[in-house]
Amino acid sequence: MTREGNSCCKAHEKISAPLATEQEYFDRYLRKTYSPDIFLEEALAFVDDAHAEQKPFFLYYPSPIPHVALQVPVEDLDAYPREWDEVPYLGGSYLPHPRPRAAYAAMITHLDKEVGAILDHLQSLGLSENTLVMFSSDNGTTWAGGVDHEFFGSTQGLSGLKGSVLEGGLRVPFIAQWPGKIKPGTVSEFPSYFPDLFPTLLAVAGQPDTRPHDGQNLVPVFQGQELLRKKDLYWEHGDQQALISGDWKLVRRRLGKKNPTTKLFHLVKDPGETNNLATEKPEVLERLLNISKNSRFPSLVFPNSGLDLP
């Protein structure tokens, strides 16, 4: 048993045929307590404690939604058309749901309410004017658990999904609010990624930036300054490797396996990564391969099968 009598269920259960009614799904797979609501309660309490003690605070709020399994309070689900879902999701990779498209949209709606609750709470405590709020996501949209990314147009023409080092797996929204520092409506084309947040937060907190890292301080970007990218962007995930250097992107996949691929894309001209220029631009390819080689350290804990293992 879990919090407030929530019984456990198999996380990846698959049913052979649709259940007779929506209520049967809810009775079998929905519980009394919705975990994102508990996350929110704890987050607001954390802010209250810091405010009561008149201390600065850093709140990292990793909402578990939207994410599979598709689960959301029924009142959020009912805001979306039943016509969206002619076929239920029977489960397998995650739990079944009678209205998977509506459930995914409703989870995003619930997240929107969470963000609004945090912003309203900061406002009620008089903290909004002196608080930097940043919103982002950890990866692109998924294919699993009944999520219909094609229905929602989630990738907007980009290649790849969650788990891929193609742009559809890497590009995520990033929104920042900082009254008096960030002009509302500002849009930046500066290429950035999560390693940039460490030096950015050090700068915001007025702390020295003395440790080696891969990031670049984004405060000048927040303030509307034109900034050049000083450090290349580098990723590894599973048997994949990617590097962005200027307008160019190197993508290596299936490393350590049969038929590995090495591709080169010009992201400005080809954000959908459809035109492999590795053969046409051998000098650019060689340069990015050398940069990627020097951008990494072998890992004994999480070895890359194609780069670390013999």
Per-range role (PLM):
Residues K231-Y234:
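WW-domain-binding short linear motifs
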Residues Q223-L228:
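Basic phosphate/pyrophosphate-binding loop/patch that engages nucleotide-derived ligands
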Residues L264-F265:
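Short hydrophobic beta-strand that contains or immediately precedes a catalytic carboxylate
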